Amino acid sequence: MSQPSSDGQRQPAIVILDFGSQYSELIARRVRETEVFSVVIGYSTTADELRRMAPKGIILSGGPSSVYAEHAPVCDPAIWDLGIPVLGVCYGMQLMVQQLGGAVEAATGKAEYGKAPLEVDDPTDLLNNVENGSTMWMSHGDSVKALPEGFVRLAHTANTPEAAVANLERKFYGVQFHPEVVHSTCGMALIRNFVNHICGCEQDWTTNAFIDEAVALVREQVGQKRVLLALSGGVDSSTLAFLLKKAIGDQLTCMFIDQGFMRKGEPEFLMEFFDQKFNINVEYINARKRFIDKLKGITDPEDKRKIIGTEFIRVFEEESKRLGPFDYLAQGTLYPDVIESAGTNVDPKTGERVAVKIKSHHNVGGLPKDLRFKLVEPLRKLFKDEVRKVGRNLGLPEEIVRRHPFPGPGLAIRILGEVTDEKLNCLRDADLIVREEIRDAGLYHDIWQAFAVLLPVRSVGVMGDQRTYAWPIVLRCVSSEDGMTADWSRLPYDLMERISNRIVNEVKGVNRVVMDITSKPPGTIEWE
């Protein structure tokens, strides 16, 4: 079982050493789907540090380097003497082979990228329940030339003789493919075999267990002190509000700053939902005029973001002093933010760890240091999908738990060019129609994001035998798993027709609706 450490923090049962793979976080997510707690740490973590962490298993991630390159990242060789099962994935497998006495070479003419059928040679142990011929995702330009002593082949593909290998006695395993990606059809079976059967991990990473632990830790940290939370209405801050309410009750104060860029009816809904229905203390701050005045004449999207962020900080600072004093600031920092700030990424040219600037949480990342808050971040262990599960278990309604992502600057960056009250009213009405029609069609939860964009141009039209010169609205709908990549959603033609007809007929100032059919990449989901 993942036991708490001396500071009350849960210790990971599985640790992933990150060698710079784009899939390292995904490996951790897949392990957690087996109800086992896992974390991503830097590849340079020493064997002594790992011994103190006492994980049940270690996974070596993939990476962009070649193990024979001059500055290739390597793990502490003493790891192989810890007596802990190890699974190497892609680069991780090649590193295992090289450090234990085998050989790796460039796969000249035999590099594999994309899907490949896996031919299973030994269906026991790691490959139990992995079907022969099942599709696995390949992404490698190197291959194993010679196995270390004690290793055997478990599987192969047409171009990769050593697609899966193992030293069964020492419980060292390597796979040249990526079992963590959705394209690998039996990837989860392999991960379960390693985590649950080979490592013997208990399945104790459950939503209810997390809630109980988080509540206890918040109570211990905060005591009788007051906590302030900037509430946006998104799933992260909403889940955090419910968790803190459960932990410390009326010691929590939420501040909802209405900057005037939210969707139609949202401020009223949020105040009724949190303050009246669930008795969470929410201070409503109407700052609409301040924000719209600051954006007068501003057209550059980055300038808009900076101005909105700066003004948010000013309002937050003023109101926190008025409502305070507060000892703690609650933030919805999630685990991907923690990973980025820890700098587990790798520069393939130098082999050095690269620190990536942590993402600022919704609007509060640049709070002045003189506010002197201590931070409460009980969600910092969780991925986004885990936050949704926690919110659901705490009683958040589905309309918030499964709410489409919404940018911090709100509609201000969905209005291209200068933001005015007239444009905001126009876009709110159009955006509401988009969401209503997609919900009525039963497609809302099948789409990652669906919204309207107002362009800073006008087009000629004809309505009631009269010439019109009005704004066009862009319909933007995308499908995605995590927002990192996205494909434009193929909406039914009759649905697009209903949306277009309603917007043109019901929204004053609009005479044309167009569809954005750009995927990400090359485009981004938002226009600004």
UniProtKB/Swiss-Prot annotation:
Presence of keyword ATP-binding: yes
Protein name, as recorded: GMP synthase [glutamine-hydrolyzing]
CDD domains per the UniProt record, alphabetical: GATase1_GMP_Synthase (cd01742), GMP_synthase_C (cd01997)
Stretches assigned to the GMPS ATP-PPase domain: 205-403
Active site, per annotation: C90, H178, E180
Catalyzed chemical reaction(s): XMP + L-glutamine + ATP + H2O = GMP + L-glutamate + AMP + diphosphate + 2 H(+)
The protein's annotated pathway: Purine metabolism; GMP biosynthesis; GMP from XMP (L-Gln route): step 1/1
Enzyme Commission code(s) on record: 6.3.5.2
Keywords: ATP-binding, Glutamine amidotransferase, GMP biosynthesis, Ligase, Nucleotide-binding, Purine biosynthesis
Molecular-function GO terms, alphabetical: ATP binding; GMP synthase activity
